[in-house]
Amino acid sequence: MLKTYLAHAIEATDGASTYDENVKYLLADRQVLAYILIYAITEFRDMTMDQAMDCIGDEIEIGARAADPGLSNLGSIRGTNTEDSVPGEGTNIYDVRFNAYLKKDGIKILVDVEAQKSTDSGKLGYHLENRIVFYLSRMISAQKLTEFFHSDYDNLKRVRGIWICMDGDDEGFIEEIGLDGKRILGDDYGIRREDTDYV
């Protein structure tokens, strides 16, 4: 019988590696990622499991790309470095990063899946929502020189961050944090949601 990646990942979680590493490898399974895409990202909501799996790019990075400035966009357009760091601040590493493609629409979405043990700001020392905004912002700003060059900002790709929080209540929920424009003064000058739908 042919074993799936998920079956191998579950077997590999024998206590030799840390809880954090185990969760990352389980989350990186294509079937698990397809399920996450369907239930957490609007663009994939009407897809079957097979359709969603077909949208997942070939490279799934596990704990390999940093979120901090200066490191997240290393490499070429197909670069896979997943680290970002600022001197004296340590390095923030994305748990699972991959690209998802809506092929018929020609859309590429950069996806980050994070396993978060605690959401308690007292334990973390910060509010988790602020870290989420930081990671999403870095996924946008790190696209320069990897997804586009010079001032070709129309080639920015959408980014999505899915944070799976382990300390939630039994019912669970999905909350969306995004960038929403709103007119404060004057006439509408034609900003369309689809032109600014990056987060």
What are these regions (language model features)?
Residues 1-199:
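Elongated, amphipathic alpha-helical interaction scaffolds
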